[in-house]
Each structure stands twice: as C-alpha cells, then as structure tokens.
C-alpha cells in the first residue's frame, strides 16, 4: 500500500521530534507499506526567515522571498532523511523541484500545474523512503524558478503527490488529534470528529478551520484521495475525510482545473420576504420553529439590515406537488406562510390587527453553478452575475459557498439563464432538480446534519446603499472586486425596494477578509459614480459564526435550534446567509466567542469515547455520535 505522510512544523520542531517521526515512518514501512513523506519547515523557521528578510529589505521581491523561504523545508527533509538512515531505513531527501512539482510562476502563491513522478517512482521501486520538501515547486517554462505555494502549502504538496501517485492513503500529521467540532481553545466542550466528508471539510477549512488547507481538500475531492488527519504525538486514529468517487480526469493543470463543473436548476420555488422595524430578539428562531413544526422545505435564507436599522428576511420554500400553471399547493399557501410569520412576530398576543409587511412570489427558481473553491476564485461569481445580466436575467437573491453559487431568479427566464451559464462555463449539460430530489428528513429521529461550528473574527462587512435593482449591477460590483483579486464570502441583497427619483434600488452587503476591506472599499468608490449608487459603509467590528453540515437547511429544526441558541444569549443577528452545506450569521465582534459557544452547545452532536490527556488523546474505542 502506498501511503503519503505529511508532518507539520511542530511535528518536526526539534531533533527529538524528528527522531520520533523517523520511528513512525520506519514502523509504517515495516507494516508492508511504501511511504512518501512530505515535511514542513521546523517549528517557527518560516517566521524567522520572514523576519530576516524584513531586516535587510523593506520590500523584498517575491522571487527572492521564494528562494529564501524554500530553504526551511530543505533543512527538515535532510535531517529526517539522516534520521531514517540512522535507523537502517533507506531514505533520500528531495526538493519540490527534484520530485517534479511543476507550478505556475505566481511567486508566493503558486498553483500546481502537474507532477512528473518518474524520479520519485524510481526510488519507491527500490524500497527507499522519499522525503519531500513541502510548500514548494518549480515554475514551468524555461526559467525553472523556485516557487512556493503559500501558507499551508505542505498540505497541498502532500495531497497533490497522493493524486499523482494514486496513493492508497494520505495521512496529515499535526499537533492536534484531528478535526474538532469547533476550536477547542475557545470551546472546551469541542469534540473530535471521527469522520467527515470532503464537502464538509472544504467548508470548514474555507471558514477558518486551520488544520487543513482548503486547496488540499479541493485536490482530494477532485481526485478521490483518501485523507486522515492525525496527531504525530500518539497512535489515535484521528479524523477520516471521505472523498467522493473521483471521475477520471487529467493530472495536467492539477490545480488549474475548471472552477465550474455543472449548472443546476431547481424550479417549484416560492420566495417569501418580510421586513420589520427595529429588530425583535428571537424572531428568526420563532419563525424557523414554526417552519419546523409544519415540516416545510426551506432552500435559502438571507437576512440583511437596512439604512434605518430595520431588518428584512427572505427565504425560498420548495413547493412540493406544485405543477406549472397551478396555484400554490396547500402546504405552502400564501395564507399559511403569512400565518407562520405572524405567529413568529406576535405569538399569542396577535389580535389580527397588525399588518405584516410580506411579499410572496410564487413563480421562482434557483439556478446554481457547482464546483470547488468558489469563494477562493473571485472571478467565478462575477462571471456568473455578468452572464445572467447579459441574458437579461435579474438576480433576486444570492447564496455562496465553496461548492456552489446560487441565484434566485424568475422561473419564466430559467431556460435562458441555464443556457447562458452552460455556454459561458463550457458545461455540456445541466441538472434539473425537482421536489423528489430533495431528501426528506424526520424532525423527530434523524441525526443532526451538523458536523462543526466555526468563528471568524477576521471579516469585514461592506454595505452599498441604493444600488439600482436591475440586471448587471451585481456583475459590475463583483467584477470590480474580482479585478482586484478580492474574494467575497457572504453576499446579501436586501429585499426591500426603495425608489429614488422613480428608480427602484436596494442595498447590497457582503463580507471580505479584513485585510482586503480597504482595497475593496477603494475599488467600489471608484465605481460608485458610474453606477450612481449611494453610500459605501465599511464595518470591521463584526464576527461571523457558521454551522457546517450536509443538507442542513433542509432540516428547519436544526436551523431553529441555531437561532434559538443565539436568542437565548441575547445575541442580535445582523446578517444571515445559507447554502446547502452551511448557515452563517454576522454578529457584533464582541459577541463572537459567546455566539460560538452558544451555537456549539445548541447544535452539535456529542462524540463519545474520547478521553483528553495532557499529550493528546488516549487510544479510543471506535467513536460514535450520541443518539
């Protein structure tokens, strides 16, 4: 069996740790395995090298930085190879260039184009352990420049080698026992997850879980590389990351594959939007409690905040049994929806006199592009929006995730939208989803779909007031950000239309990394005059708390528990977005840690049979979720 083992900086942070890793590698070989080891720089070596560069230059070139930083891994691979040889195990150390990792020429953030495994395969056939420098490669073309893959690059190197060599297993060894349901440094009750899907892991990684780089998960998902995240301090089994059965694909352009693999259309959607004055704490929790009790299928959820601090919430409901041309079925009738929202707003005190401001649009559809690494590729969303605009399709709601970008549109133009997207992204065919394709869940007995909760304190919210509500506006806004290579996470389009000089407008808000907030604001201000929008507001005092899990929004009881947990802690929700695999809320930054603890306690299942010890976890019985 061919096994790739990757060891992070803390795992090889001292001579003693390197010797311990050598013992583990030798034992793996003795268990009748062939082994490739990918190693990071020792301890804080990379940080020390960065400090040295700053000491001699205020603005070092990206090329020289790659030349400098790549030396850190060369020290650790040579030492580990020596340690293996000392144990009588044949081993050889090779740089990324020497094993044939070919990248593009983007110094500091290179992407792998291909791996030429001939040399590494030669040594493996001789029974030699190959110790590879992670984080680095060599540019294509005639220059043969040393390149680095960016922070977390050793994860990427290991999984890419696993794909190129068709490894049976790729083990990622770290200083933690595996993937936890949340950050155990913030939430002591965090539990180790025994098993997680690639889709779930990709969302967790993109939301800030730092155990595994999102690009590494993306490669594993695309090529079906089996992954395990384990502690280098003990023999506990860690967390298995389950990859889907991979479709045959070329190893050329390994990290430069098409971002979009498919187009999905889902009809039979009803859009429900309501708005209110000042926020009433717990209203969203009550609303989804009512939805759960009536077992309605909710597809997307958004909430935004208006200029006058009023809030609106919109959601799409799947209309089961609805046939084109018929009126709404009883399950999602306009009257029923209004009753649900009224009950959530006013409860038992409602006397029938209060008017609920609500809009129900029956003939709606969702169109989505699917792939991997969507948020990390800022041009993808912009291209989708511009394609729809050119086809004359107006976007009413937007949902983003690492796996899918979804837009709510009028069903009358859905065929036009699908055709345009298939042509723009070179997709051969689209998938039409219907009510029968939606998994049914019992609110009483099915296990929680939630696998983890993540807190991100490094986001900023940018709000653009009074954007014209017409096709093409989202394309212009996010196209401008894509030109600046700024990735956008949450996107919320207000559902309350305001007319200025007779022109319908709405507010659009989105989140970016705090480090990109100033550049994003400047880029949009340069565009503001040409699109005649209003004020641009930047808020860095926010936190984003998210739940991740497959099919989560299809279980409204879980969504209700999420919102109820926040309401019980008196935490005000500023914004909400959802997708198939996650639901995210923006709250005040000072309430971020409290929010994470609340939603983890209220929404995460318990993992049994793991006992914490000072140096990690004792070898457990097979872990299970508590019922």
Ranges and model annotations:
Residues 1-218, 316-318, 408, 587-591, ...:
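Nucleotide/pyrophosphate-binding catalytic subdomain
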Residues 27-32, 60-61, 113, 121-130, ...:
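Solvent-exposed alpha-helices and their adjacent loops that cap or buttress functional pockets
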Residues 79, 164, 211-212, 221-255:
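YjeF_N-associated NAD(P)HX repair module
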Residues 135, 174, 205-208, 221, ...:
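Short, structured patches in soluble enzyme cores that scaffold and shape functional sites
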Residues 35, 89-92, 170, 227, ...:
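Hydrophobic anchor at the start of a short beta-strand
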Residues 199-233, 367, 418:
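Phosphate/diphosphate-binding loops
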Residues 56, 240-627:
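A conserved regulatory-domain signal marking ACT and ACT-like small-molecule sensing domains
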